[in-house]
Amino acid sequence: MIFYNRVINKGQLKKLISWSFNNYGTAITAQMANKLKDLGFRYATKAGVSISVDDLQVPPSKRQLLDEAEQEIRNTTERYTKGKITEVERFQKVIDTWNSTSENLKNEVVRNFRSTDPLNSVYMMAFSGARGNISQVRQLVGMRGLMADPQGEIIDLPIKTNFREGLTVTEYIISSYGARKGLVDTALRTADSGYLTRRLVDVSQDVIVREADCGTKRGVMVTSMKDGDRVLIPVKDRLLGRVLADDVKDPKTGEIVTQGHIQAVKNQVLTEDLAKAIGKAGVENVFVRSPLTCESPRSVCQTCYGWSLAHGHMVDMGEAIGIIAAQSIGEPGTQLTMRTFHTGGVFTGEVARQFVASFGGVVKYPSNVRTRSFRTRHGDEAMIAENNFDMIILGVDGRKETIPIAQGSILMVQNNQQVSAGIVLAEVPKVGQVRKTTEKVTKEVASDLAGELKFAQLVQEEKVDKQGTTTRIAQRGGLIWILEGEVYNLPPGAEAMVKNGTRININSVLAETKLVTEHGGVIRISSSPLYSPEKQNETNVLAQATQESTIDELEASMTGTSAQLPINTEMPDNLPREIEVITASVRLDQAKVRLESISNREQYIIETQNDQRFALKVTPGSKVGNHEVIAELLDENYQTSTGGIIKYAGVEVLKRGKAKQGYEVVKGGTLLWIPEECHEVNKDISLLLVEDGQYVEAGTEIVKDIFCQSNGVTEVHQKNDILREVVIKPGKLHSGNYEIDLGDLTLMDGQIATPGEEVIPGLVTSELKYIEYIETPEGPGLLLRPVTEFHVPDEPGVPSQKSINSSIELRAVQRIPFKDGERVKSVEGIELLRTQLVLEIGEEAPQLAADIELLPDLEEEGIMRLQLVILESLVIRRDVVADTTQGSTSTRLLVKDGDVIEAGGVVSRTQILSKKSGEVRGIREGSEAIRRILIVREADLVKIPVNTLPSVVEGDLLVAGTEIAPGIVIPRSGLVSKVEETVLNDGSKGYQVILRKGRPYRVSTGAVLLTMDGDLVQRGDILVLLVFERTKTGDIIQGLPRIEELLEARKPKESCILVKYPGQAQVNVNDDNVEVSVVSSDGTITDYPLGHGQNVIVADGQNVNVGEALTDGPQNPHEILETFFNYYREHESAYEACLRSFEACQRFLVNQVQAVYQSQGIDISDKHIEVIVRQMTAKVRIDDGGDTTMLPGELIELRQVEQVNEAMSITGGATAQYTPMLLGITKASLNTDSFISAASFQETTRVLTEAAIEGKSDWLRGLKENVIIGRLIPAGTGFNAYEDALSAEINRLEQNWDDDLDIFEEGDLQSVVLDDQTARSLEFENSLNLSSANQNFVDSQGKPQSQSSFIDDSMSEFSPVKDKSGSVLDDSDFPPGNFDSDFPADNYDLEHEIDLEDDVYDGYDDFDENTPDLI
């Protein structure tokens, strides 16, 4: 073995260990790894590698790269301010410029390290794969680059510094956006990933290897997985450990591919060597067995699964491959990013290949070139090639270069144009590139200055959508000009006092507003807070002045906020904040209000002149509406001592009363009250101490711990042995000795007997009684119950009141809380009649609310009067000094306190004054209210003197840098407002151009216009929404959410349209709409109507196949399944159509899930995903049960349905019709055969209820259901599916047993892992020792082996070890011990080399750049 003089990095270490493991087994590899570790540590302790600040070398060319980028951006900004490009194009250009700068700087960093300091510790760490990657090194010594904001949009201000130089404050804050996002992301990811794993385990836990070979002829075709040109997973990697379903033939020779003595024939397991041989032979499609097509019922067979990736041998029987698959997919979940990046349309460098001129010269196109003009995403004019041709560059020195241009390429140069070296000539789209779908997005353009709008070359059109809203759209692109001026916002209702063209000075009145009262009334100027003692005198004076007392509400919380900006207000300081107009008021002039303490609660009591006492029910200072209760009479006269029955005698109430408020009395009369005591108990019947119908004395214990308060007869209510209530009815019981029919007694029940009436012969009443028939323990009887009478007057007394307007008054109302005949259950007394004071507001203003005010009395101290007022509050503008967009204001009050004002009267007037002198513009004549006024000031004009007649006329719009006369260019963009003659100093005639400053904004076609020609705008107003298309990156929904979307089989929001029948696509493009149809080979035409915003991605005349996408957007797996099923169903049986449509859907799901993991650089074997997808596509939905027992809508396994259908066709019955179903993992888990497993997952009650109703049985086939009920799981050692077959085999072995046979022949032993304590007692004849580094790969004389090397350039694979005679050695020649010096190296020849070359470092393309916070 020879010495291998090369740096061994991470990848090569992996290969070394893998080689050792495959060829020499576990024990030796473990020892070798141990020795390698010791070696590593030995050298690590001799020299340490650390990073110091000095190791971070910033490339010297950084400054120059940044300067170039900044210059480019300055040029772009200048083009933008001149209106040459739109805001979107500017943004795009800036982002692209910084992206390429960052990329160039990264290359520069690597070049700098390589050329100046290859032993730099940062460089060694990152590039050996020990720690860190190029992306992180770039942030340390390059520049951090562009970052995204919290919404995922890119901020066009890059971080130009790196961590070595330190970040500025701004950069630090931009940086922290991404960091915070990262933290939040990680926290969410862990939970999401865990839940995903749980669902996956649940759906696949019952997949166990139960048989050796299912014997299926089906399989799947394995190809390389690609993204555009880039191969993500080559075929050889996807084949490892699979079993071939068909022979693999070399495409060149047509012979079966062979590696060593192994042939790639059907049922052969693909080892690493064989897979590599197939890859080398250039075979692109290999037909292999797969869990997807395995025909084992409820499991997967060994052959379809292939190797167990844990040990690289065929999977064992009873292996729980479902759980392994679930964990393999779920575990890397935390490494997937969840964040979606809206890059604002940033293109990656992969989209197109650029051709750059390598030398200066002239561009020549052939004569047959067809091109059309095109505007690039940076706003440059270019052309698109419509056919293929060769572009030729002829150099000055006779050099010639030919560049092949493909159809669809963007040409940046014209024919015969002179170009210099380094100029981009063309961008050629990559062939077979992944469809980049686009989406329409809008970007707002805000005005940078205030002024007047003018549209130039802009053609508008109005569109009305289904809802009837009108949008104005730019039919042809153009410019929106803003001509500078000072714009004043006017408050609502302001009236302009000037006209267009008026010259005004500082403080001229521009407009005025009036404050008007709506209802009219008495003016009250609000200035005092509630109950302030120092304001007492003012209030008293005011009270006398307006014949009523007043007290202010609390300071109005409303301050004049309205739609316009605040005003600079010039106001006398004594101007009130608000003015109140009293529209109506009512006052209780004779009643006194006192604050009393009633049962530990403070309450306002109103005492009227006729000694009635009312309790105030509302708080002072609050507002009350029409018909609300203000106060309630405190009256003991209608109080009872217990509950009872109420009956009306002559009393009439309003029918529409609400029981909650009580029934309003319309006509007085008498209320009859029959008292009774009612105890609600709700206890066990055993606690009852009296009988039903028993007569008890007051104080008797009727139920444990409950005593009655009056004498009477008991009535017990019970239900289901629960005692509900006990009623004690007072009265006199008459029973037994009256000669009267029992029937007559019952007729008297519920009647009232008047005094002197004979109830039954011999029984005369002396007072009013209520008769009740009752059953007592002694027999039937009559109970004469006492009746109390309460008199109700027709009208209650109303306190005296004074009002200044008859539209508001207080009315006294009597209300009875119970209806006629109602039984009131109570032990305590209740109130039978309430007298309330209610507010009545007249017809004129029932919607207004009144304020409750308590006013101090002028004569008596400590006494207050109650007053209700209806106020209209008018807020006087007194806004703080705010914005320069406002003129200053002056406000004048036109009323005094106590004035009476008519409805519609003016209370105050506010004038808006100008701050600068100038000319008034922009007032629109017509009906619409004027909201803004523009003043053109001197500062908005530029005067340019010229000697000769200028080449411009009044009204021209010019951009900065335009020549207006020979040698004279204008410094600013703007509008020529005047060209006038002047006299120069020498007396000759000259000219003066007066330019009104302005600024153009470019508007692209299709933009939504939010302003109109001639509008006045303030700085920051949105002028227009630019509509543009940006590419959606393939994974706009990235990482975990995408995996979840696929495995839960969710329908994407806007999916693409799929081809239903193969044929030729026809695309017709009209002005606005695109029509797509497909013509099949038999001439049928299928139309495909496009949805809103869908873009066609097929060309006219292109051949399309079934299931292919016609438009952009994500594919819907349910639609794929349905499309293929409907297509195959026309030609094949339902079963075959089902299998083939499932196959298409499975292929889509496996590849999509793989793509997400690959985009994050995570490798997962296909077979794991296939096991999960198999579970998702196992069931079909029954459409028609035929003669079977299956019901429509049932979900049943396809295999099961097919067995039933086969039986039906034999017996001649009608078969079941079905449709394939794709179930998400959650749904599949809930639809498993085992209800125990499903119930333990989700919706436990529903699953168990359904199982009970259907009488289901659980056959305990999976792991979960066995774990739940505590049995041995049917996997691993508990695997018992083929017990019979196994026991038969054991019997056969026992019969053929030979005691003398030594089955452990020497040489048969594999290298065994000795992990028990007995290993030390075993003796090995010769032991291997890997220790001494110098003897690792040399022979005993120390000479390198001549015949082969540890590594050579052919770099095949590690191959078998031979001795000098050429015979291959097996593992027994290497006893598992130490590689000691007595290892006879001389005899052995390592012909097997380690394939390390693939991984030798060749640049840094393979370093991960997807760090989460960078783009």
Swiss-Prot record:
Region (Disordered): 1335-1390
GO cellular component terms, A-Z: DNA-directed RNA polymerase complex
Reactions catalysed: RNA(n) + a ribonucleoside 5'-triphosphate = RNA(n+1) + diphosphate
Enzyme class: transferase
EC number(s) given by UniProt: 2.7.7.6
Required co-factors: Zn(2+)
Compositionally biased region (Polar residues): 1335-1351
Family matches, as InterPro entries: DNA-dir_RpoC2_beta_pp (IPR012756), DNA-dir_RpoC_beta_prime (IPR045867), RNA_pol_Rpb1_3 (IPR007066), RNA_pol_Rpb1_3_sf (IPR042102), RNA_pol_Rpb1_4 (IPR007083), RNA_pol_Rpb1_5 (IPR007081), Rpb1_funnel_sf (IPR038120)
Cofactor: binding comment: Binds 1 Zn(2+) ion per subunit.
Disulfide cross-links: none
Protein keywords: DNA-directed RNA polymerase, Metal-binding, Nucleotidyltransferase, Transcription, Transferase, Zinc
UniProt keyword Metal-binding present: yes
Keyword tRNA processing in record: no
GO terms assigned for molecular function: DNA binding; DNA-directed RNA polymerase activity; zinc ion binding
Classification via Gene3D superfamilies: 1.10.132.30, 1.10.150.390, 1.10.1790.20, 2.40.50.100, RNA polymerase Rpb1, domain 3
Record's function text: DNA-dependent RNA polymerase catalyzes the transcription of DNA into RNA using the four ribonucleoside triphosphates as substrates.
Name of the protein: DNA-directed RNA polymerase subunit beta'
Source taxonomy: Bacteria, Bacillati, Cyanobacteriota, Cyanophyceae, Oscillatoriophycideae
Gene, per the UniProt record: rpoC2
